[in-house]
């Protein structure tokens, strides 16, 4: 919210509506409203993305541990974790910014917390898979192999909107997101989790 309010277009609209620049108090108030609304609907958005359950099953069959990082708070995860488990997804560990002094992505600390909890001795044994530029940056800052996932990503937009595009437009959008991930430093970019 703070970042958005610093965007010139949004700040200009704010000033037109309220007659003054936004303040830190405004940021806190907006975040409180956002969090309240999000908490009221969060349980509807805990379904694993396509191919995740199949990939997790294969990784576990190979003895690979799964740690997760999130931008959600612990309170939000208290809603998401049980719903995701009901749907069949349960990582071995997960960490939110609450676990690392409220310093989330793109900082690497949640990855390091996962490594410690899972007894992983080297960043060379870690693959970070994510669907945002912040995920990619988090992985790169941690020094781990980092994979960007295009379809279903926040960078791509809503699935329904994507599905409505022509094949040509889909390919353009895929390439745009692929380039964003590569520019952020992704070691690999895959179309969907099934390619992992």
Kindly label every feature range from the protein language model.
Residues 69-71:
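Structural motif
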Residues 53-61, 73-196:
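Asp-based, Mg2+/Mn2+-dependent phosphohydrolase catalytic module
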Residues 5-51, 62:
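Metal-dependent phosphoesterase signature
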